[in-house]
């Protein structure tokens, strides 16, 4: 498990999917979560909110996708440029939604995903409200 946001968020590595556990339920950003659920944004990974030992667990189904890090490692220069272009487009699309703070994106290349076949870039947005972030 890895800690993020000064230990207020922990990544859980228990399945093929990606999940995070909020150490304090008060940091959950309900407006951001609702914006995510109401958007038909092809670049946001769908977030599922569950309860886990009384804490909020955020689950993103990533098992069918490939990490951007793996895609970049296997791509030629044209493929790399295409993936970078798609990543920039995805970031701009999310930024234009409003209500979502770009600082709450898990920006590690191993946690940005590419959908096989379509090559759509999928991004994990963490709906959290932290001092200095929102």
Q: What does each model-identified segment do?
A:
Residues 105, 110-114:
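Hydrophobic residue at the +6 position relative to the catalytic HRD Asp in the kinase catalytic loop
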Residues 89-103:
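Protein kinase catalytic-loop region centered on the HRD/HxD motif
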Residues 82, 86-89, 113:
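Elongated alpha-helical scaffolds
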Residues 63, 110, 124-126:
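Structured beta-strand/turn binding interfaces of compact recognition modules in eukaryotic regulators
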Residues 2-84:
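Conserved structural core of kinase catalytic domains
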Residues 49-50, 86-90, 133:
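Short, surface-exposed, polar/charged, turn-prone segments marking secondary-structure boundaries
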Residues 11-12, 98, 113:
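A general structural signal for short secondary-structure junctions and capping/turn motifs
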Residues 102, 115-134:
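C-lobe/activation-segment region of protein kinase-like
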């Amino acid at each position: 498990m890895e800690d993020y946001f000064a230990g207020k968020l922990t990544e859980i590595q228990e399945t093929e999917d990606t999940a995070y556990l909020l150490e304090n339920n008060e940091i959950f950003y309900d407006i951001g979560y609702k914006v995510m659920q109401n958007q038909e944004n092809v670049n946001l990974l769908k977030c599922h909110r569950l309860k886990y030992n009384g804490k909020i667990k955020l689950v993103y189904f990533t098992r069918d996708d490939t990490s951007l890090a793996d895609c970049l490692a296997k791509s030629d220069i044209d493929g790399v440029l295409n993936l970078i272009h798609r990543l920039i487009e995805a970031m701009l699309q999310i930024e234009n939604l409003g209500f979502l703070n770009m600082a709450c994106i898990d920006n590690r290349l191993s946690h940005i995903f590419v959908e096989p076949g379509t090559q759509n870039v999928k991004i994990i947005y963490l709906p959290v409200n932290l001092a200095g972030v929102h």
